[in-house]
Amino acid sequence: SNQFDIRIVSDNPITWATSTGTCAADSSCGWYIDLDTEVGEKMVANPILRGGRLIFVTTTPSLEACDAGGSSWLMEIDPYTGGRLNFPVFDLNGDGVFDFNDNLASTDGGTTTYTPVSGKRSKVGILQPPAILAGVGGAGDGGYGGAEAKYSSGTNNAQIDVTIENSGILRAGRKSWMQVK
């Protein structure tokens, strides 16, 4: 099944500087992500900057004191704003195509809004940062770009989490140049 827990980050506007050129101590400049610190969620590995996306894994330890396990989220956001991407990253409906149908639909007051998803919860425990394989087959682009696979080892019985994702603007393949004399 392609069902998994999802996260959506905001796309609030960013204040990069004030008219005085300084920022208050209340973090009024730049962006941050408010992780679920009540349960101890942290980012403990370096993020990956790839194709205009910031890719990272968060980790939440188990609530049981003697349990070495926990859970993780695989997140993909805009590195410049800290907000969600403007295209679907995850194949929510499992049809092998990244398109409009992979956004989260929500209705409020008769108006339906479609929002790209920013993260997915691991089903294999705590994840390591993913190894990324670009140009994987089997997923059409739906006008949003090609597909890539993210492989992360989990703490549950050494299982591997495989996520086929939209690579967005990143185009894999041979890069070449010509020397001009």
Task: State where each predicted segment sits.
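Beta-propeller fold recognition
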Residues: S1-K181
